[in-house]
């Protein structure tokens, strides 16, 4: 997969290329219509889905499709809403959503990958704490947080919901 740039040199289209074929045969799988938005494509942590992310400076929208499909039809995860940012990842049958919707300093939602309209709060927003990005390893979700300018790492067992904090520093950054 690759993105093509528009006349303003911004990525606005996603194409699929099959090795050994001409680029003239490449298939357009996504085209961003809003000139203020750009797009890109990535693979989820469990490599089960491709995510097409489109965004401007304050708003995002994601589409997904299974990584093992030949019939590519990107599915809208959640319609864009002005000033709402979100990103999705998948791990062990769930989509995890890092978003600022109704959460100035972000929160993490999740839903089963086959039930995207059934989002539940997994990590709530926290007063005066920025809930940062997340990564996955085996049965664990690793995320960063920052409170009073002091960063910390949290490791959560996604089966038991037990969580452990790893202190990085007691000094503000």
Where are these regions (language model features)?
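Peripheral, non-catalytic segments that deliver or gate enzyme domains
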Residues: 1-173
């Amino acid at each position: 997969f690759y993105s093509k740039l528009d006349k303003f040199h911004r990525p606005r289209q996603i194409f699929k290329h099959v090795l050994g074929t001409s680029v003239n045969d490449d298939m357009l799988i996504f085209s961003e219509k809003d000139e203020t938005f750009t797009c890109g494509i990535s693979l989820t942590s469990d490599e089960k889905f491709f995510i097409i992310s489109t965004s401007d400076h304050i708003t995002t929208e994601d589409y997904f499709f299974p990584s093992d499909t030949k019939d590519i039809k990107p599915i809208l995860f959640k319609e864009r809403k002005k000033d709402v940012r979100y990103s999705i990842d998948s791990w062990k049958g769930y989509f995890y959503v890092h978003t600022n919707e109704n959460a100035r300093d972000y929160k993490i939602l999740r839903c089963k990958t086959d039930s995207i309209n059934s989002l539940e709060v997994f990590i709530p927003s926290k007063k005066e704490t920025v809930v940062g990005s997340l990564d996955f390893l085996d049965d664990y979700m690793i995320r960063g947080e920052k409170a009073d300018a002091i960063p910390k790492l949290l490791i959560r067992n996604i089966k038991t919901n037990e969580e452990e904090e790893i202190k990085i520093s007691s000094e503000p950054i």
